[in-house]
Each structure stands twice: as structure tokens, then as C-alpha cells.
Amino acid sequence: MQRHIRLAIYDLAKGNFQELAELAKGSMLPILSKEPGFVEYGVADIGNRQLCSITIWETREQAEKSVHLASSWVKDNVSDRVRLVTTYVGDLAFLAASPVYA
């Protein structure tokens, strides 16, 4: 089954990554997880005061809709802490996990 990804890169302007990750987990994750087609969500510290937000969706349309969901959440919750650098929506060729994590 084809999956689709939304990947966004942000500059961290204020605070630290761990604070933002906890806020995203507690506030953004519940919003995304209620959306049709939601598969996975995570954030990663990619260094140089940047972070990456990753969501995986069942359809490309759902991935594209998540761009607007994320934008609204950022505006309402962390607009003073992060600045969007770029967003990508694409088709995920594959995503494999170790049996320990599957």
C-alpha cells in the first residue's frame, strides 16, 4: 500500500528542541491522530537549531491537508518559537522497521 509523507523543516527561534517536541507530542499529535488517514507523526532535532516534522498518511490528499493543519497549529501555538523553512509532500517508496520496532 502506497503511503505519503509530509516533511517540514523549521528554524528554532526561541526555546529548545525538547520543549517544542513535548508541546508537539501533547498538542499537535492529538489533532493529527484524529484525522482520517493518519499513520505516524514525529519530530527530529536535525542540528543547527533546526527541527524536522514528519507525518505519514494513507493518501497524498491527506498529506497535503496536513500542511494546513500544521500551519494553523504553529500559528496558534508556537509562532514565536519556530519559523518554517520549507515543506515537502511526497510519495513514500518504502518505510521498513526492525522487528523490534514493528
Q: What does each model-identified segment do?
A:
Residues 1-52, 58-72, 78-102:
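Short S/T/G/P-rich N-terminal loop/turn motif that feeds into the first structured element of a domain
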